[in-house]
Amino acid sequence: MSKPNHPRTLADSEAEAVLRNLRCSPRKLNVVAASIRNKPAGKAVADLTFSKRRIAKDVKKALESAIANAENNHQLDVDRLVVTTADVGRSIVMRRFHARGRGRAARVEKWFSHLRIVVAERDIETKADRRARRAAAKPAASASPAANEGVPA
């Protein structure tokens, strides 16, 4: 018996694309997926375009599909999209054998993967915004006299 399937429901500001049975091991695909997580969609597409990994082309297609779904099906602003999740899952493993010497055989496993990309509409924070936010939080922490008590002069 398998456990019941409860797909994650998407929010109104999210769109997804799913690729099934990609001919790449989940371990290798996860390296590429991790490189685009939490990035603005435009930057993620640019990174995948110039990636040297073979599977990056398929990941880019899935990301472009998610962006198109967001624009056409959910009427989201393309310039404000961020890759919120890029999930990699195991698919089938095709097993073959490789003939070896003295009548022996070695097992060859060809791994397949599933990929699910979710993009969401958010305000994209620039470096200047991030610096300003961190600068505003920093003086409050260092201004307290208790922080400097144990420091010899």
Curated annotation (Swiss-Prot):
Q: Which GO terms describe its biological process?
A: translation
Which Pfam family is one of this chain's hits?
Answer: Ribosomal_L22
InterPro entries recorded: Ribosomal_uL22, Ribosomal_uL22_bac/chlpt-type, Ribosomal_uL22_bac/org-type, Ribosomal_uL22_CS, Ribosomal_uL22_sf
One annotated Gene Ontology cellular component of this protein: cytosolic large ribosomal subunit
Query: Which residue intervals make up region (Disordered)?
Result: 128-153
Its domain of life reads Bacteria
Alphabetical UniProt keywords: Ribonucleoprotein, Ribosomal protein, RNA-binding, rRNA-binding
Q: Which GO terms describe its molecular function?
A: rRNA binding; structural constituent of ribosome
Q: Where is the composition biased (Low complexity)?
A: 137-147
Q: SUPFAM superfamilies recorded for this chain?
A: Ribosomal protein L22
The entry's function note states:
This protein binds specifically to 23S rRNA; its binding is stimulated by other ribosomal proteins, e.g. L4, L17, and L20. It is important during the early stages of 50S assembly. It makes multiple contacts with different domains of the 23S rRNA in the assembled 50S subunit and ribosome. The globular domain of the protein is located near the polypeptide exit tunnel on the outside of the subunit, while an extended beta-hairpin is found that lines the wall of the exit tunnel in the center of the 70S ribosome.
Summarize the subunit comment: Part of the 50S ribosomal subunit.
The record's section on NCBIfam families has: rplV_bact
Per the record, the similarity remark reads:
Belongs to the universal ribosomal protein uL22 family.
Please report the name of this protein according to its UniProt entry: Large ribosomal subunit protein uL22
Q: Quote the gene name from the UniProt entry.
A: rplV
